[in-house]
């Protein structure tokens, strides 16, 4: 039987800067290091793969939407020489108010809907897709925990496996629900 540190070395676990990633890595390393599964390793790897896939999708979509917002802000804040000359000429003209209204509505599309509404609709769609993925993940985890309960074990090992599986499932789902709602 290997110690906790030997298992950490065998798994080559890298902990990144992200707070949620560190929590998930800790939970799965703790889960893998404290269980004595032999045939259930494939199930654990499947759970890890599904959860990491969802987490990577969540982080990449979050960073992608943040990148979109930043690029939109940067593109809207860049003033070219032509814009500067137009701005100076409009100060001298009598329709200064009209120019400021045009600048105020610069972020709108021709239909009059601001771009942030498009991003908001996209984020709502992403959250709905994540909710569906989380529901599928919960069904898969329920099925895997049912299969683990069905495997013949001694009473102590059964209770240990059941406790660890249920606690890791509950904590993982709560983390995803927290990230989904925030």
From Swiss-Prot:
Glycans are attached at residues 88, 120. The keyword Signal applies. Keywords: Cell membrane, Glycoprotein, Lipoprotein, Membrane, Palmitate, Signal, Transmembrane, Transmembrane helix. Residues 1-35 form the signal peptide. GO terms for cellular component: plasma membrane. It is found in: Cell membrane. It is a single-pass membrane protein; Lipid-anchor. The chain crosses the membrane at residues 162-180. It comes from the Eukaryota. A lipid is attached at residue 168 (S-palmitoyl cysteine). The keyword Protein transport does not apply. Major antigen in the surface tegument. This is Antigenic integral membrane glycoprotein.
């Amino acid at each position: 039987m290997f110690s906790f540190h030997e298992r950490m070395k065998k798994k080559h676990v890298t902990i990144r800067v992200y707070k949620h990633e560190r929590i998930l890595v800790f939970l799965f390393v703790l889960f893998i290091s404290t269980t004595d599964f032999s045939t259930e390793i494939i199930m654990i790897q499947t759970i890890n793969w599904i959860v990491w896939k969802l987490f990577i999708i969540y982080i990449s979509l979050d960073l992608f939407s943040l990148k979109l917002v930043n690029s939109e802000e940067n593109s809207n804040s860049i003033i070219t020489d032509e814009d500067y000359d137009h701005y100076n000429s409009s100060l001298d003209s009598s329709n200064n108010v009209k120019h400021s209204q045009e600048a105020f509505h610069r972020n709108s599309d021709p239909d009059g809907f601001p771009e942030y509404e498009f991003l908001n609709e996209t984020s709502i769609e992403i959250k709905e897709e994540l909710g569906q993925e989380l529901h599928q993940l919960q069904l898969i985890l329920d099925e895997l925990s049912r299969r683990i309960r069905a495997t013949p074990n001694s009473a102590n090992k059964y209770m240990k496996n059941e406790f660890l599986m249920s606690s890791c499932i509950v904590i993982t789902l709560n983390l995803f629900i927290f990230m989904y709602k925030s």
